[in-house]
């Protein structure tokens, strides 16, 4: 008998994947966590019925969250990742030699535990000497920080459950306070097909706080619609004005210096959302 997992991305649309076996399942303090082995995408992390990452396509999301802001900032030394318990963003952050410390604040320690066990190629960097892992509320961590970070990356789930506070104007204001005077932040902001209002609202809120606010995209097969957006807010540096000598060689599968700028070229219907 074949076993299939289906994520209902809207009431009337979803994606499905053939499952070889279930590796782990439990209701944590915060959410339903499932780790499964799929036929097509390798091991897959699912939270509250939503695909968070897979071994096959994880590099797209993690590279685009990390490298766009880190190449935009001329000397990022202290980096904060809110969420991201699978460790993929941290792995990419550590590819930048200027980064002296990377802090991960993940509310659900079980995500970290089982990512290390079943997604070692993604989570392996969490034990690096430059990394500090904190299990706790990222919203509260931001509120308690001031003038501390060069770059903050918000690697959250959808705006439901424990992540709901990470999509508010108050949170973005807190991020601005936690950043240094030339700091940059980036957040995943879902897709323009099914959640256009979210993108419009987030960009509007961020624009009221950060003088440079831009939206960029990436193609991620297992995420709703496949077209994913990220919002970047910067106090000083424009991601579209990065000099050529800023780009140093790192090993990537998706991100390139050409794609860095190209990712900000938006389809018209997406650009219309943020006019």
Swiss-Prot record:
Return the NCBIfam families for the record: MFS_SpdSyn, PRK00811.1, speE
User: Domain of life here?
Assistant: Bacteria
GO CC, alphabetical? cytosol
Q: Where does S-methyl-5'-thioadenosine bind?
A: 31, 106, 137-138, 162
What keywords are assigned to this protein? Cytoplasm, Polyamine biosynthesis, Spermidine biosynthesis, Transferase
Provide a Gene Ontology MF annotation, just one: spermidine synthase activity
Q: What are the binding positions for spermidine in this chain?
A: 62, 86, 155-158
Question: Where can this protein be found?
Answer: Cytoplasm
Pathway, per UniProt?
Answer: Amine and polyamine biosynthesis; spermidine biosynthesis; spermidine from putrescine: step 1/1
Name under which the protein is recorded: Polyamine aminopropyltransferase
Record-annotated active site: 155 (proton acceptor)
- The record's EC number reads 2.5.1.16
Q: Name the InterPro entries on file.
A: PABS (IPR030374), PABS_CS (IPR030373), SAM-dependent_MTases_sf (IPR029063), Spermi_synthase (IPR001045), Spermidine_synt_N (IPR035246), Spermidine_synt_N_sf (IPR037163)
Q: Which gene encodes it?
A: speE
Question: What does this gene product do?
Answer: Catalyzes the irreversible transfer of a propylamine group from the amino donor S-adenosylmethioninamine (decarboxy-AdoMet) to putrescine (1,4-diaminobutane) to yield spermidine.
Source lineage: Bacteria, Bacillati, Bacillota, Bacilli, Bacillales
Q: Name the GO terms of the biological process aspect.
A: spermidine biosynthetic process
What family, per the record? Belongs to the spermidine/spermine synthase family.
Native species of this protein?
Bacillus cytotoxicus (strain DSM 22905 / CIP 110041 / 391-98 / NVH 391-98)
